Amino acid sequence: MATFAVTLGHGPRWDASRQIRDQRGWAEHARFMDGLVADGFIVVGGPLGDGQQTLHAVDAVDELEIRARLSADPWARAGLLVVAAIEPWALWLDCRRLAPEPRADSLTRGEQEAV
């Protein structure tokens, strides 16, 4: 498993006269994306700057898995969303990682007995 930076952009059927949540099929798209978050596939994500693109941190085996899963998005199937870029992302700062175990010599006597 690796982490990727995935940039999504507006597809050819995006209605520029509407806000993101007013686009056709918003509820279905939102449910789909919430499912990817619940599965641990999307770690974090959201619109960038003016909202023309969104950036997601995605945990996946490879680019093929990412493209396959995102192609099932109702917005992708409707032409509202396209994958603009997928890049491997070497996260050096990641709050999802567990804190290191404390060194035994730094524990108090009570803490040592509890371990």
Task: Locate each region found by the language model.
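Conserved, structured core segments of small domains
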Residues: 1-115
